[in-house]
């Protein structure tokens, strides 16, 4: 019966397990002010609004 010659390190074990559980890319949402696509939980790059308030003036 085959037996490992050396103990597998914690780093190698975690890297091997992480290869099977890759994160999915976040989707876009439409801005409620200008209806342009933007990343969620971020200021809209087109109009500068976040949560209904103008954060960045254009």
Curated annotation (Swiss-Prot):
One cellular component GO annotation, for this chain's record?
large ribosomal subunit
Query: For bias kind Basic residues, which ranges apply?
Result: 1-19
Q: Which UniProt keywords apply?
A: Ribonucleoprotein, Ribosomal protein
Q: Name one Pfam family in it.
A: Ribosomal_L32p
Transmembrane as UniProt keyword = no
Q: Where are the transmembrane segments?
A: none
Q: Name one GO molecular function term.
A: structural constituent of ribosome
Instruction: Write out the ranges of the annotated region (Disordered).
Output: 1-22
Q: Which GO terms describe its biological process?
A: translation
| Superkingdom, natural source | Bacteria
InterPro entries with a match to the protein in the record? Ribosomal_bL32 (IPR002677), Ribosomal_bL32_bact (IPR044957), Ribosomal_zn-bd (IPR011332)
Q: Tell me its family.
A: Belongs to the bacterial ribosomal protein bL32 family.
- Name the chain's protein: Large ribosomal subunit protein bL32
What gene does the UniProt entry assign to this protein?
rpmF
